[in-house]
């Protein structure tokens, strides 16, 4: 029998009011006045992982790390990887190279000061590295990150490079890009790595997709989600568009149970360890 493949379990540590789609309703200068729910939700995720003996990677905002350093230390103390999600959840595509570099450097310094460990991984908010700003990979390498997980090789209205490699690749600057998982069907890539699709579609489909990546491609999958996705009690933004409300709030009440099944059905580890020998 073939050995069970260990997949990468990743969590983007941001709160509901920091989501790109809700940015018009929560200006950054007002974030400190908004009730924050991230700590309780991440603690629930840590307990869930511990119950399955699983490890993961937490791509954490520097802004949150400054305000909840104890949470960051708990993540690291439990054996998980603390990686960077930038400082203020600004899309890379909205920044100049100089501003982007400053943002990801600040986040790295904050996280390393809190944990005492090197921070080697980075994920751009909203997978905002696309064909128009591939310069971002050079900035990421320049700051000292070893890998990025910022490209989603799919067609989407807000992100994606549909023809990007489906599996990790090494750039000329030495940086390894670890794209979110997809499956190939009908001549295109389909999302298979979590996020809103994990909530919207039946769990059986996500399970089949990850199993397909493991069995047909013989590769580890990389899965992602956010702490707010297990929090059906979060404040509702009624002023958001119907499309945004649907995408953000659909099936929040079921996500934690689905994660529990996911952790049971597959083997999970940290991205830096799962993809240590990638590319």
Say what each PLM segment does.
Residues 201-279:
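C-terminal domain-boundary segment and adjacent tail
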């Amino acid at each position: 029998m073939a050995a069970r493949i260990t997949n990468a379990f990743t969590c983007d540590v941001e709160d509901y009011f920091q989501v790109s789609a809700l940015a018009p309703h929560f200006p950054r200068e007002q974030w400190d006045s908004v009730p924050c729910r991230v700590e309780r939700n991440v603690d629930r995720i840590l307990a869930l992982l511990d119950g399955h003996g699983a490890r993961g990677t937490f791509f954490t905002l520097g802004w949150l790390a400054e305000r909840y350093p104890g949470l960051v230390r708990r993540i690291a103390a439990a054996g998980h990887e603390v990686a960077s999600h930038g400082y203020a959840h600004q899309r890379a595509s909205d920044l100049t190279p100089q501003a982007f570099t400053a943002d990801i450097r600040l986040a790295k310094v904050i996280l390393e000061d809190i944990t005492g460990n090197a921070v080697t991984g980075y994920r751009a908010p909203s997978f905002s590295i696309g064909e128009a700003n591939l310069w971002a990979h050079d900035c990421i390498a320049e700051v000292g990150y070893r890998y990025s997980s910022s490209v989603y090789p799919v067609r989407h209205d807000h992100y994606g490079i549909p023809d990007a490699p489906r599996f990790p690749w090494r750039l000329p600057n030495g940086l390894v890009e670890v794209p979110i998982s997809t499956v190939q069907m009908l001549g295109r890539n389909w999302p298979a790595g979590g996020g809103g699709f994990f909530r919207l579609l039946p769990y059986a489909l996500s399970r089949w997709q990850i199993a397909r990546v493991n069995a047909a491609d013989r590769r580890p999958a990389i899965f992602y989600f956010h702490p707010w996705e297990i929090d059906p009690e979060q404040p509702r933004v009624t002023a958001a568009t119907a499309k945004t409300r649907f995408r953000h709030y659909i099936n929040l009440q079921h996500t934690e149970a689905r994660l529990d099944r996911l952790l049971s059905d597959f083997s999970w580890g940290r991205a830096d360890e799962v993809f240590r020998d990638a590319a």
